[in-house]
Amino acid sequence: MSLSTLKNRRERGFFDGQFLIAMPGMEDRNFARTVIYICAHSDAGAMGFVINRPQSLTFTDVLLHLDMIKQEEPIVLPQRARDFPIQTGGPVESGRGFVLHSDDYASDSSIPVSDDICLTATLDIVRAISKGAGPKRATMLLGYSSWAAGQLENEVANNGWLTCPANEELIFDRNLDDKYERALAGMGINAAMLSAEAGHA
């Protein structure tokens, strides 16, 4: 599923607004120990973002790359902009930036993905954030994760993923180190026990 499909969807699918939590046996290194927020799911496939993978780039790096600031300017950015989190959202279009954010900010290009969360993938939100404005809660993700028609359903059926309702606090939490464990804990599952059980399956 692509961003254009997300824009044109008419109804929400079964996995919309769900977390996917990778099982210990996940063989794809792109998704090992990941938590993914599913933004859209339909008969055409699914699209979402990894929310617990750091990115080496900073928001200042992004602004420099987009020529929004000059090399000598980063220090004048508002503190909120300098601290703005950048994460790896997935292996598809990994050079493209997407901003998941609270619904207090909206532009003509913003796409609602839940009652409280929107997705914007245009420069207007980057400019707003660089000025210390923009949404109260947000994170930028480079790339996204995508599944073809029926692919995600098959992976879940084959025990590749656990699923649970998404938690907005976890989506925007900047502490990435233990998000995987906390997502599992939210389901009442101990990550260490899950790994041990998978190893003896």
From Swiss-Prot:
GO terms for cellular component: cytosol. It comes from the Bacteria. It holds the Pfam family DUF179. Gene3D superfamilies: VC0467-like (3.40.1740.10). Belongs to the UPF0301 (AlgH) family. HAMAP family: UPF0301. PANTHER family: UNCHARACTERIZED PROTEIN YQGE (PTHR30327), UPF0301 PROTEIN YQGE (PTHR30327:SF1). This is UPF0301 protein RHE_CH00966. It comes from Rhizobium etli (strain ATCC 51251 / DSM 11541 / JCM 21823 / NBRC 15573 / CFN 42).
